[in-house]
A protein has these predicted regions:
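Conserved oxyanion/phosphate-binding beta-strand-loop segments in alpha/beta enzyme cores
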Residues: 1-36, 66-75, 98-106, 210, ...
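Conserved phosphate/anionic-ligand binding catalytic regions in large, soluble enzymes, centered on
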Residues: 240-262, 422, 428-430, 434, ...
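Residue patterns forming the tRNA-binding/recognition surfaces of aminoacyl-tRNA synthetases
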Residues: 10, 14-18, 91-247, 335-451, ...
């Protein structure tokens, strides 16, 4: 058994002293490989045992690629703006930067003791002004080009946190962090127009190697639908538009539903006879989250606008108008047409409110439930109760009805998206300051480049008051008066997702103070070749980074549209009781530093890679750590202490060695680390059975194993007689000819019972196999005093002897 603490400390010092993993980004002589981990938020609790799983995966691949002759970039940094540091500042009155820097040091120490091959000279932190200088610069370009803008809109407001939250930060009507109530309220918000990028984001999904489930989540989140926007008149004056993908059902409209919090309802209020009821319902609606309002199993609540009716433009029929919380003011037109015979939600709403139903597509009874488009499209179903369009197929009617409405001048074909504006402001302190000044004349002024970065000011009070941002407390800082321009700075800060939307670019050239990164370097190193991180970021960070990268591509700053060529999601490592580790459940957290101290970092890395497929969630087991350490000791004894290593090859391990090199190489490429380890275990078992182990074979196994267990890999490499690091040694190769089986195992049966087996050369004739079978001592004993009646040879498998 080796001393893991001594060995690991020794090699970590060696790597640091020799800058072993420092990447010369200007070396274009080798093919490049850019491996990236989703960088962590440096929380106060430090790393837990779940963190190293994904980090080890990229580490293994990047180490292999380095040995294969690639110039590897494998950086690490910190997503260091965020709410926990802000809450610390509010509670203690201390600037969150000190708290954050302390946490970064803790995280860095933990990562370094795990032996990852990160180039620490390229470390970044999103809260570093040298970094957020360029976050502000990119935002400035987005603002100047009209993609970032101020919009009056309903938002998720958390009074307890004193800030606006994005949809992905709200779970079941409560804030993701802290579980505080979230309500909807109208506010002027700084937003980024995501929908402007929708088509290219959808197209780009076809060009990247990502999990299909993640791509589908993004498609659904974007929510592209093609349909018709139709204008409806209101009896007594006024009009509104609806968007529908089912224009063929327009003759089946029996009511309309408006968003309770939309402007139209307020405009109609003087004509509404049941105003008190309507106002109460509106008040009830704004207390609900968007998710609660749009959940499919809900949507039956609402109120009829007494005194208000709409006119169906195709037949002049007057229909009732309702408000319902499932209609959102900021989605589509904020109004929907309701066809209860052909939409299940409308059907249930009609039942609840005693509204008529009109069937307009034949083919199914609609007395119990709606006959919906997924059931009638492409089935040859025809229209009924639809005037001149009766008898047409659904597909024919779509075209004909659309043409009629367009010719009437009240409709247009259009594309709609579920995609909303990305709210790009938070009423928090610990985030990037927005480089905008609000002038007295109501216009906005964007800071010139020479005034970037706009640095966060120190505050005496880090808590916002009365719904205002904490930066409102910076009375001197917020007053702007330079070069004849006077105004008040924007006091909201950018969301936590701002820095992570482009950080992968900064790693390439992290100390450039003239531009976010050198264009030549960006062209060479992008896109990221392998990106590993959790699936929970599918419609957040992974969407935002694609938007920013597409925008920077349009600007000619990056040379590729998509930032991440291949994406892999690691599964969660759960506590021994199956509970997720993390800051929400601290008592279930396994501290990797404790494992490193007891077993060694190599053991932790090996165990986590051997637990099962990378993408699956797996429960932690201390017994698994014991087993992993015992196997590492077994390998060490074989190669260093057994005395079996020789410069002469007897050929007995040729096949298993070449099979191992082939399988481990392929498995590392596909991130199938558990099966790669299994194959190395097979080799080690065979090597223990052998009299000697050919030294180049031992060295090849050590090279491959060193990607998973780098410290003991380096140590064994040195003890095998090498002076330089293993990190840049050439990757092992295999001989295809030696992968083929050159012998077969043949079983011998006498009267149907197995009596022995033997090894024979591949291609042996039946006569040769029969001869070898007869020479077995156990077979000869069974045949004593008997006459052989028949010998049946199943070539390559069995020699069956019948005797009596």
């Amino acid at each position: 058994m080796y001393d893991h603490l001594e060995v690991e400390k020794k090699w970590q010092k060696y790597w640091a002293d020799h800058e072993t993993f420092k990447t010369d980004v200007w070396d274009f002589s080798k093919p490049k490989f850019y491996a990236l981990d989703m960088f962590p938020y440096p929380s106060g609790v430090g790393l837990h045992a779940g963190h190293p799983e994904g980090y080890t995966a990229t580490d293994i691949v990047s180490r292999m690629k380095r040995m294969q002759g690639y110039n590897v970039l494998h950086p690490m940094g910190y997503d260091s703006f965020g709410l926990p540091a802000e809450q610390y500042a509010v509670q203690t009155g201390n600037n969150p930067n000190g708290f954050t820097q302390t946490n970064i040091k803790t995280f860095t120490k933990q990562l370094q003791e795990l032996g990852f091959d990160y180039d620490w000279s390229k470390m970044i932190a999103t809260s570093d002004p040298e970094f957020y200088h360029w976050t502000q610069w990119i935002f400035k370009q987005l603002y100047k080009d009209g993609y970032a803008k101020y919009v009056d809109m309903p938002v998720n407001w958390c009074e307890e946190l004193g800030t606006v939250l994005s949809n992905d930060e709200v779970i079941d009507g409560k804030s993701e962090r802290g579980g505080y109530p979230v309500i909807r309220k109208n506010m002027k918000q700084l937003c980024i127009d995501q929908a402007a990028f929708a088509e290219r984001l959808l197209e780009g999904l076809n060009e990247i190697d990502w999990p299909e489930s993640t791509k589908e989540m993004q498609r659904n989140w974007i929510g592209r639908s093609t349909g018709v926007e139709v204008q409806f008149e209101i009896v007594g004056g006024g009009k509104f538009s609806i968007f529908t993908t089912c224009i063929e059902t327009i003759y089946g409209i029996t009511f309309m539903v408006l968003a309770p919090d939309g402007d139209l309802v307020q405009e109609l209020m003087p004509r509404i006879k049941n105003q008190e009821e309507i106002k109460a319902y509106i008040q009830e609606t704004v207390s609900k989250s968007e998710m609660d309002r749009t959940e499919l199993n809900k949507g039956k609540t609402g109120c009829r606008l007494e005194g208000i009716k709409a006119i169906n433009p195709v037949n002049g029929r007057e229909v009732e108008v309702f408000i319902g919380d499932f209609v959102l003011a900021n989605y589509g037109t904020g109004a929907v047409m309701a066809v209860p015979s052909h939409d299940q939600r409308d059907f249930e709403y009609a039942i609840a409110h005693n509204i008529d139903r009109i069937q307009v597509i034949e083919g199914q009874d609609v007395s119990e439930h709606a006959f919906e488009k997924q059931d009638y499209l492409g089935k040859g179903c025809k229209l009924i109760n639809s005037e001149e369009f009766t008898g047409l197929t659904v597909e024919e009617a779509k075209v004909a009805i659309t043409k009629k409405l367009v010719d009437m001048g009240i409709a247009k074909e259009t594309v709609n998206y579920r995609f909303r504006e990305w709210i790009f402001a938070r009423q928090r302190y610990w985030g990037e300051p927005v480089p905008i000044v609000h002038l007295e004349d109501g216009t906005d002024y964007v800071l010139p480049d020479e005034e970037l970065p706009l640095i966060l000011p120190e505050l005496e009070d880090y808590k916002g008051h009365n719904g205002k941002a904490p930066l409102e407390n910076a009375t001197e800082w917020k007053q702007y008066n330079q070069n004849g321009v006077k105004g008040v700075r924007e006091t909201s800060t950018m969301p936590g997702s701002a820095g992570s939307s482009w950080y992968y670019l900064r790693y390439i050239d992290p100390h450039n103070d003239k531009q976010l990164a050198d264009p030549e370097l960006l062209k060479h190193w992008m896109p990221v070749d392998l990106y590993v991180g959790g699936p929970e970021h599918a419609v957040g960070h992974l969407m935002y980074s694609r938007i920013w990268n597409n925008y920077l591509y349009d600007k000619g700053i990056v040379a590729c549209k998509e930032p991440f060529k291949k994406l892999v999601h690691q599964g969660m490592i759960l506590g021994e009781n199956g509970i997720k580790m993390g800051k929400r459940f601290p008592k279930y957290v396994v501290n990797p530093s404790d494992i490193v101290k007891k077993y060694g970092a190599d053991t932790l890395r090996l165990y986590e890679m051997f637990m099962g497929p990378l993408e699956q969630s797996k429960p932690w087991s201390m017994a698994g750590c014991d087993g992993a350490r015992r196997w590492i000791d077994r390998v060490y004894r074989l190669f260093i202490e057994s005395g079996k290593i020789t410069d002469t090859n007897d050929g007995k391990l040729d096949k298993v060695y070449n099979q191992t090199v082939k399988k481990v190489t392929e498995d590392y490429e596909s991130l199938g680390f558990n099966t790669a380890i299994s194959q190395m275990m097979i080799f080690v078992n065979e090597a223990y059975k052998a009299d000697t182990v050919y030294k180049p074979y031992a060295e090849g196994i050590v090279k491959m194993l060193s990607c998973i267990t780098p410290h003991i890999g380096e140590e064994m490499w040195q003890l095998l007689g090498h002076e330089s690091t293993i990190a840049y040694e050439p990757w092992p190769t295999y001989d295809e000819a030696k992968l083929v089986e050159d012998t077969i195992t043949c079983v011998v049966q006498v009267n149907g019972k197995v009596r022995g087996k033997f090894e024979a050369a591949v291609g042996s004739s039946n006569e040769e196999l029969q001869k070898q079978a007869m020479e077995l001592e156990t077979v000869q004993r069974q045949l004593e005093g008997k006459t052989i009646r028949k010998v049946i040879v199943v070539k390559g498998k069995v020699v069956n002897i019948v005797a009596n």
